[in-house]
Amino acid sequence: MRSAFAPLSLMFRSAPLALALAVAGLSGSALAAPKADIQALAQKHQQPLLDTLRDLVHIESGSKDMEGVEQIANYVAGKLREQGGKVEILQPTDVYRLGDTPEKIGPMVHAEFKGKGSSRIMLIAHMDTVYLRGMLKDQPFRIDGERAYGLGIADDKQGVALILHTVAMLRQLGFDNYGTLTVLMNSDEEISSPGARSTITRMGAEQDAVFSFEGGGTDGGVRLATSGIGAAYLKVEGKASHAGAKPEDGVNALYELSHQLLQMKDLSKPETGLKLNWTVAKAGTNRNVIPAEATAQADARALRVADFTALEQAMQAKVGHKLLDASKVQLKFEVRRPPLEANEASRSLAKQAQTIYSDELGLKMSVMEKATGGGTDAAFAALKAKGAVIEGFGLSGYGAHSNDAEYVQLNTIVPRLYLATRMIMDLSK
């Protein structure tokens, strides 16, 4: 069987799209019942995975909680070392500072497993949560029926646990036909990954396939596209003066800000998914003082990476056309998270995942090509990627970022372990 897949590895290195199409075709011609050894092992890992989830949930790891993110990074690194990986804890060095980026950013865990093949595969998830220290008491780990509840359990500690146990399953199966299996987990995803984004992009560019383990939603689907998130900050400097006695001596920053906002009101392009909406504005200190400063913030969304670049260029051109020559206008544009764009390589691998789910497990899996909701780190992995990038390999669940209802569905543990293991094995041949 390995000889039949040997040319596939060569194709994967030179032409990821051709490889993805070939893999999809091969999977369609080899439909079978579940692989008994993989299924049995996945079932054996259900309780250990829940034990891992309990440990992860009980580590409070908010993005800005350095003690917590360092603790969870050490825990994850230890688990990966147990599986024989070359593991390092990386401190971010190339930081993309956003308006709300904290001074100190948490670490990444990077592990590499070398095999005897040639395919390069990467698994990603994030260890941080949106929650503050002390909130664990309100959402401790617990199991109620077919659901496991806990702080950050769906977003994204289930993804961390799935990767750890997928790696363990591969080792127990004695499988190492890949070239390299890379694991990368960061602890700043919930604050737009300012420290990890460059590393994710660099490593993503080296891979033949990247699987991201954010949750599979309520229906267990995988995602090929996510929306990009941007932000614009406009600052106008004028000159204060008495609004009643000498208004002509001032430079009204509010007038200039209003002019700027109005001339940018038509930059949205709904037909392509580009949206720009000004949402916050502030000016002045007192009713009787001409405002010397005015600021505004905008939310931007895009479905294509190039649209953010074009939008920023258009906005910068607009601010040069001022109402008041004496005013100073500054515009800062942030790409908080780029969009993930579907391509043929990701479509083909997603089809393969669907085939495994339907023909081997008797389960349905949706593939979402239209971006919905927030962005994820999969988009950073895809920025310079040559191969497929697929989001949503995690457990089904609900309630991310909620106060008391975050959970994952227990009946998705075995299928997701099976799927991740099968996909890695198929792509490694």
Model-derived regions, located:
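Short, solvent-exposed loop/turn segments at the edges of secondary structure
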Residues: 104-106, 206, 227-229, 291-293
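Acidic/histidine-rich catalytic neighborhood of metal-dependent amide-processing enzymes
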Residues: 152, 156-229, 269, 428-429
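N-terminal signal peptide c-region/cleavage motif recognized by signal peptidases
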Residues: 25-29
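Soluble non-cytosolic domains of exported or imported proteins
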Residues: 43-47, 63-71, 154-157, 161, ...
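Metal-dependent amide/peptide-bond hydrolase catalytic core
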Residues: 33-37, 79, 84, 215-216, ...
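Acidic, glycine-rich active-site loops and adjacent beta-strand->loop/helix elements
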Residues: 127-129, 184-191, 215-217, 240, ...
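Acidic/His- and Gly-rich active-site-bordering loop/insert found
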Residues: 33-151, 169-173, 177
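Bacterial N-terminal signal peptides that target proteins for export
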Residues: 1-18
